[in-house]
């Protein structure tokens, strides 16, 4: 009888040890964030910059960056405003301190690009104002869903940025500058 009891106890111990819950070690928040950042893919798009030789030409520049969850047109607009040209043949025509407030794209193909008031900085001259307006417009119209661009300052339509070019109505792509 003792052998039977001993055998039963041994069998119960083996069964009980196999029933413990196997919980994998939890990943801490820092490792999870690092893994998520590493999984982000690269995105690329074209922004247009003024030719530095004053030839009234906009030159395409390919920008690559990590996907941040924003739309490609919004990333392109932000890159146009926040990055400097990588080629000496290109000039940055965006006034210092300008920020993108928002970009909204309507179903009719009109993009509303809203900037801080620094975009309308005085003293750009007619050439600078034209190149700025069409750098924005041609960058955004690279995307097939955008047909025209309404430039806004602090959420409102402006008649002009610095007194030379009418931007009260949406602008369309200017291929003569390309």
Regions found by a protein language model. Give the residues of each.
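Bimodal "functional hotspot" detector
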Residues: 2-178
């Amino acid at each position: 009888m003792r052998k039977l009891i001993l055998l039963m106890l041994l069998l119960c111990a083996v069964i009980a040890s196999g029933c413990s819950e196997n919980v994998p070690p939890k990943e801490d928040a820092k490792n999870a964030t690092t893994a998520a950042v590493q999984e982000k893919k690269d995105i690329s798009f074209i922004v247009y910059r003024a030719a530095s030789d004053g030839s009234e030409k906009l030159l395409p520049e390919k920008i690559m960056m990590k996907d941040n969850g924003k739309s490609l047109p919004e990333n392109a607009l932000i890159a146009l405003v926040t990055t400097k040209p990588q080629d000496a043949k290109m000039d940055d025509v965006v006034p210092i301190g300008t920020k993108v407030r928002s970009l909204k794209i309507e179903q009719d193909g009109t993009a509303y690009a809203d900037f801080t008031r620094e975009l309308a900085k005085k003293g750009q001259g007619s050439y600078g104002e034209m190149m700025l307006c069409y750098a924005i417009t041609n960058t955004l119209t690279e995307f097939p869903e955008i047909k025209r661009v309404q430039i806004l300052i602090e959420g409102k339509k402006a008649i002009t940025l610095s007194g030379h070019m009418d931007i009260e109505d949406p602008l369309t792509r200017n291929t003569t500058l390309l």
